[in-house]
Amino acid sequence: MSMQFANVWERVADTVGDEIALINGDKKSSWSSFDSKAAKIATILEEHGLKSDSKVGIYLHNSNEYLEAQYGVFKIEGVPINVNYRYKENELIYLLDNADAEAVFFQGCYADRIKAIKDQLPKIKVYIQVDDGTEPLMQGAIDYENSISSAKEQKRFNRTEENIYMLYTGGTTGMPKGVMYKHGSFIPSMLKTAFAMGFEVPEDINDLEKIVSQAKENNALTVSM
């Protein structure tokens, strides 16, 4: 099994599924729930024509939904694109077009901003709105939770660590620029951090249970926002 983010997180979910993975305020999600929602998001994206190497904009605040969406994109071997919520319309158009984005997850409070630019983004196949209680569902968008509740989980497969992980810069010296990493090089660098923290780092993903068990003992399995 290769060092690809979805492969790794699936292995964690299988090992410690009942442990808490995400906390955002009063909202908590176990590793099993995290994996299940991501698998359904993957199905939704595939049903709208996205596939390996498809780019997906994530225009969300730090939240459980952000990480679920990102995980779902990794499951289809797609490329999640970080979108700064402070960007104005011209920056959003540039970034999403430059990235060749085919889907966008967006916070409900930015529905008017997305509505104003969507006609200038012909490559986008689906808009997925996360309801935050601020705006009604944008015409032409699908609701995040409702679509997940009716979706089936994507069947698992072994993905390649040649998949790309791309981070867009902040644009302080011009428009944002995408910086690309391969999963197979990015994940080992993260494991070096775990080693520096005193964890026993596995040489192969099939030994991942070692570090997961240690993380469980040290209460280090949860992302809090």
Predicted ranges, named:
Residues 30-31, 164-192, 197-204, 208:
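Conserved AMP-binding A3 loop
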Residues 18-63, 70-71, 88-93:
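Conserved AMP-binding/adenylate-forming core of the ANL superfamily
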